[in-house]
């Protein structure tokens, strides 16, 4: 039906006859001529219908936006004054001699000349996908997956599919369950990850595995999450955590070079503890140079503990941010920031404006001026390396509240004052996570998952001091986004059972949920490690998209619904009866 694509015609094709298929993007009737911007997935080209060719001109009068058409014509060079340097086909146009209207279109519910609301875009996704922005994102996604497969194949990895219908196991988020018709009252689960299967593959002797795989998690959504998502899943036998990180680092560097023509520097590496202390987050955005500065020792006197109303029995912290040239901030803006940190449970936000360092207490304006003396102020200025014109924001509270509040304030101020360098890429590795986390009842749970190996102790010490265990795990962060996470896995069956015991999984539950893994670990399981990278997030970053929905062809809403197909939906009662499922009234 066609000999060329619209976006691929160039000046070298002048005087050539072409057949094109596509959609009407825009129509302009100038009396003697009708100009049509014709579009396919490669781009736009201008088509001219002349009045002197009246038969085809008359047909062109009926054209409207998004009509699907076929055009036969001759490529001709545009006059210099009419050339459009903004598009790749701007030097040429097509003089049409045949027009076939393949299909008409209703008036569009979307307006491509302005921003449409998200619900309309998702309901009419088949129209939204015609926009060049979304289409370009999907092309880039396609190129990224090609580059990944090429890279992994050259590194001797095998692309192996793992089951979609699998067993429900506790992995953190809720499972999507699938009832079995053949096994009455039993359920499959859609995998949150291929974690256990890829470990089984290592035990099976599959030395290097990878897969670009769909995963499913029934959890609360946000702009960078979807209920079904795609991850680059990797597992390797006989490889250290350091070598896994080097492998992934080289893959990420290749993607950024090929897609964005950017040479990423070597990824720095910091511990979880350092990340929380300096940035208040285990996903720090290093494009923002502001760091949290601990001043607990400066305020250790009892009078300060009393002033800040700190409970000595709690794990407290006093810390601050130094904002360069921020002393100009108004009282209203400071009040806004105070309200902001209160969202993260901080009771108060104190400030010190440095007008003139040399004048000591006379050279500042502060909400805590009445408790400062010259010695304390000097220590604060030296510790924060603050200068004239700077402002210090200080919070005194429980450590986790201080970390979270100053971490979030750091990000907000970085954006508000244009401190965050938006045109930079700052990847890093976070390592040395705690093995376990403790809830308010004192129960322990795995920070990553229960298959992560411990890094700093043997089984005997782990049994007696699980609170001190450090996991051999690692997260990859780019510009504040968690791109991936992985770990060295437990390959000793007794260690695996002990970790299950520590996090409170009873023996009966261990056998019911993980019996196949426990049994497999008894047969010479090799040391192995792996990682999972979020493909959707990688594409979102590389395309500079604001929302992960813009890099997925058919995404869900933040309430996990598909507006185009109106799913999830009810099903026939006969189907439910076959599955032994009954509706319960809420």
Curated annotation (Swiss-Prot):
Q: Pfam families of this UniProt entry?
A: GAD (PF02938), tRNA-synt_2 (PF00152), tRNA_anti-codon (PF01336)
Principal EC category: ligase
Question: Transmembrane residues, as ranges?
Answer: none
Question: What are the start and end residues of every segment in region (Aspartate)?
Answer: 195-198
- Please tell me where L-aspartate binds in this chain: 171, 217, 448, 489
Q: Where in the cell is it found?
A: Cytoplasm
The UniProt record gives the binding positions of ATP as: 217-219, 226, 482, 534-537
Keywords carried by this UniProt record: Aminoacyl-tRNA synthetase, ATP-binding, Cytoplasm, Ligase, Nucleotide-binding, Protein biosynthesis
Q: Which CDD domains match?
A: AspRS_core (cd00777), EcAspRS_like_N (cd04317)
GO terms, biological process: aspartyl-tRNA aminoacylation
What reaction gets catalysed by this protein? tRNA(Asp) + L-aspartate + ATP = L-aspartyl-tRNA(Asp) + AMP + diphosphate
CC terms in the record's Gene Ontology section: cytoplasm
The record, for InterPro entries, names: Aa-tRNA-synt_II, aa-tRNA-synth_II, aa-tRNA-synth_II/BPL/LPL, Asp-tRNA-ligase_1, Asp-tRNA-ligase_1_N, Asp/Asn-tRNA-synth_IIb, AspRS_core, GAD-like_sf
Among its keywords, does the record have ATP-binding?
yes
Enzyme Commission designation: 6.1.1.12
**Oligomeric state and partners?**
Homodimer.
By sequence similarity, the record places it as follows: Belongs to the class-II aminoacyl-tRNA synthetase family. Type 1 subfamily.
Provide the protein name: Aspartate--tRNA ligase
Which gene holds the coding sequence for this protein? aspS
């Amino acid at each position: 039906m066609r000999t060329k694509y619209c976006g691929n015609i160039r000046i070298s094709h002048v005087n050539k006859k072409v057949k094109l298929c596509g959609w009407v993007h825009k129509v302009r009737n100038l009396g003697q001529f009708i100009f049509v911007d014709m579009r396919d997935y490669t781009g736009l080209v201008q088509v001219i219908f002349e009045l002197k060719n009246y038969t085809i001109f008359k047909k062109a009068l009926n054209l409207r936006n998004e009509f699907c058409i076929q055009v036969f014509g001759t490529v001709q060079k545009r006059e210099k004054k009419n050339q459009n340097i903004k598009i790749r086909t701007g030097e040429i146009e097509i003089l049409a001699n045949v027009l076939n209207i393949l299909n008409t279109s209703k008036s569009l519910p979307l307006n491509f000349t302005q921003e449409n609301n998200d619900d309309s875009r998702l309901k009419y996704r088949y129209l939204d996908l015609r926009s060049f922005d979304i289409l370009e994102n999907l092309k880039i996604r396609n190129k990224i997956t090609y580059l990944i497969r090429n890279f992994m194949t050259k590194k001797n990895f095998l692309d192996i599919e793992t089951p979609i219908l699998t067993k429900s196991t506790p992995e953190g988020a809720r499972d999507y369950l699938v009832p079995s018709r053949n096994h009455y009252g039993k359920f499959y689960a859609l995998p949150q990850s291929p974690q256990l299967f890829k470990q089984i593959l290592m035990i099976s002797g599959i030395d290097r595995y990878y897969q670009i795989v769909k995963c499913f998690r029934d959890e609360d959504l946000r702009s960078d999450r979807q209920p079904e998502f795609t991850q680059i899943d990797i597992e390797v036998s006989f490889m250290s955590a350091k070598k896994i990180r080097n492998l992934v680092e080289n893959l990420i560097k290749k993607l950024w070079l090929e897609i964005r023509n950017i040479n990423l520097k070597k990824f720095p590496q910091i511990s979880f503890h350092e990340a929380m202390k300096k940035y208040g987050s285990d996903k720090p955005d290093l494009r923002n140079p502001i760091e949290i500065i601990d001043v607990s020792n400066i305020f250790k006197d009892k009078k300060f503990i009393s002033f800040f109303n700190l409970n000595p029995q709690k794990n407290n912290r006093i810390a601050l941010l130094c904002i360069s040239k921020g002393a100009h901030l108004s009282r209203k803006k400071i009040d806004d920031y105070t309200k902001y940190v209160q969202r993260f449970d901080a009771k108060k936000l104190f400030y010190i404006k440095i007008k003139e360092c040399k004048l000591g207490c006379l050279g500042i304006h502060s909400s805590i001026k009445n408790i400062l003396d010259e010695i304390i102020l000097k220590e604060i200025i030296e510790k924060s390396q603050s200068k004239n014109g700077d402002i210090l924001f200080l919070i005194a509270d429980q450590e986790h509240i201080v970390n979270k509040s100053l971490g979030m304030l750091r990000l907000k101020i970085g954006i508000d004052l244009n401190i965050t360098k938006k045109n930079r890429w700052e990847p890093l590795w976070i390592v040395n996570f705690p093995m376990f986390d403790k809830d308010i009842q004192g129960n322990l749970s795995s920070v990553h998952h229960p298959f992560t190996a411990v890094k700093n102790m043997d089984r005997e010490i782990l049994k007696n001091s699980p609170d001190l265990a450090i996991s051999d795990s690692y997260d990859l962060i780019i510009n504040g986004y968690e791109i991936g996470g992985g770990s060295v896995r437990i390959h000793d069956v007794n260690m695996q059972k002990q970790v299950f015991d520590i996090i409170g999984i009873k023996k009966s539950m261990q056998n019911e949920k993980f019996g196949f893994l426990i049994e497999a670990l008894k047969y010479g399981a090799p040391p192995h490690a792996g990682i999972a990278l979020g493909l959707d997030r990688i594409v979102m970053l590389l395309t500079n998209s604001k929302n992960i929905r813009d890099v997925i062809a058919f995404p869900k809403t933040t309430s996990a619904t598909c507006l185009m197909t109106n799913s999830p939906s009810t099903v026939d009662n006969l189907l439910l009866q076959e599955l032994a499922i009954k509706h319960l009234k809420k």
